[in-house]
């Protein structure tokens, strides 16, 4: 019997976890009042309460704008059944305009764990083995460059052309056109 509780940070849509339903007998979503981008260390008490309120032993932490695809759903279900470890690190792959961004290496975060092995203080961790899953959680950033520019125009201060070019050149470490477009737009603004 495969049962999973999803602890949601922010508003997580049902479509974000729908691929899990094909592999699980029961799926529960535990809503929290936590901000989507908050550090889990800073809200340990609230996270512990959410884990205690969950009905199932296996817990998945998902943030707003993140979603599980079919490959990750199958890997999560298989990992829960084999129980090779009590915790699983999962990378987050940001999507920009529908394509994956290549901005640095993400070692992953402990996002899937068995509640009885959760350490209740400090960094999020489990007592026992932690394994990194192959597939990643996907996170939507902006659906288009126009949406990205509009957001920055409202919430950030523009840079000069020279500063923008210098920032872009210092951060550009890829030849992926989608990632370069993202970095060029980001370099144009100073976010508060």
Stretches found by the model and what they are:
Residues 1-32:
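N-proximal low-complexity "stem/linker" segments adjacent to membrane-targeting elements
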Residues 2-4, 56, 85:
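Local beta-strand N-terminus motif with an aromatic residue
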Residues 17-20, 45-48, 74:
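A generic local structural motif
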Residues 30-40:
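A short beta-strand-loop structural module common to alpha/beta enzyme folds
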Residues 44-58:
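Active-site nucleotide-sugar/metal-binding loop of Leloir-type enzymes
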Residues 48-51, 69-192:
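Catalytic-site signature of metal-activated, phosphate-bearing donor transferases
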Residues 56-67:
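Short beta-strand-to-loop acidic/aromatic patch adjacent to the donor-nucleotide binding site
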């Amino acid at each position: 019997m495969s049962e999973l509780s999803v602890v949601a940070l922010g508003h997580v849509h049902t479509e974000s976890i729908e691929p899990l339903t094909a592999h699980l007998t029961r799926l529960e979503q535990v809503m929290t009042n936590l901000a989507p981008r908050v550090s889990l260390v800073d809200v340990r008490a609230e996270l512990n309460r959410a884990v205690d309120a969950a009905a199932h032993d296996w817990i998945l932490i998902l943030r707003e704008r993140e979603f599980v695809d079919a490959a990750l759903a199958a890997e999560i279900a298989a990992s829960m059944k084999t129980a090779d470890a009590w915790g699983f690190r999962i990378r987050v792959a940001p999507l920009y305009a529908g394509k994956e961004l290549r901005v640095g290496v993400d070692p992953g975060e402990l996002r899937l764990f068995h509640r009885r092995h959760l350490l209740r203080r400090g960094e999020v961790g489990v007592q026992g083995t932690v394994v990194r899953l192959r597939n990643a959680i996907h996170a939507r950033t902006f659906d288009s460059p126009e949406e990205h520019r509009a957001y920055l125009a409202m919430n950030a201060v523009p840079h000069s052309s020279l500063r923008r070019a210098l920032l872009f050149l210092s951060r550009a470490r890829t030849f992926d056109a989608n990632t370069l477009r993202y970095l060029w737009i980001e370099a144009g603004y100073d976010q508060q």
